[in-house]
C-alpha cells in the first residue's frame, strides 16, 4: 500500500490537487476523509463538490464520521458512485485496517485527505 498524506490543513483547492495526484497512480485508488471543516457557510457546498470530484478518481471511499461526511456522500451519489465502494466508519484508527482489507491484485494508493481538529465533535 502506498499513502499520500494530505491530512494537515485541507482546503478545497489543495484537496482537488491531491485528487489529481491520486488520479495519476496506476493501482486501485482509495480516498480516506472526514471531510473539510472550518469553511464557514460554504462548508457543505465544498464538501459536496469534493464528493463529486472523488467519484471521478477513487475506486473506494472511506468516510470518517457519518454526519460530517454526508455532503461528500451526497456528492458521490449525485455522480452515481457505487454505494458498495463506500465505507463509513466513526473511528479514524480503523481506516488503516479497512484500507488493507481492500488489497487485491493491484497496488493500493490511499489518499488521506484531512484530519479533524482535536476539538471537533460530531
Where are these regions (language model features)?
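ATP-dependent carboxylate-amine ligase
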Residues: 1-122
Amino acid at each position: 500500500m502506498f499513502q499520500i498524506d494530505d491530512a494537515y490543513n485541507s482546503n478545497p483547492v489543495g484537496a482537488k490537487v491531491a485528487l489529481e495526484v491520486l488520479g495519476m497512480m496506476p493501482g486501485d485508488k482509495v480516498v480516506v476523509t472526514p471531510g473539510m471543516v472550518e469553511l464557514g457557510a460554504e462548508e457543505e457546498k465544498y464538501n459536496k463538490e469534493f464528493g463529486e470530484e472523488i467519484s471521478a478518481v477513487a475506486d473506494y471511499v472511506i468516510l470518517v464520521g457519518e454526519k460530517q461526511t454526508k455532503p461528500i456522500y451526497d456528492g458521490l451519489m449525485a455522480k452515481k458512485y457505487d454505494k458498495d465502494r463506500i465505507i463509513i466508519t466513526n473511528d479514524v484508527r480503523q481506516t488503516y485496517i479497512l484500507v488493507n482489507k481492500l488489497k487485491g491484485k493491484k497496488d493500493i494508493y490511499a489518499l488521506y485527505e484531512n484530519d479533524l481538529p482535536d476539538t471537533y465533535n460530531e
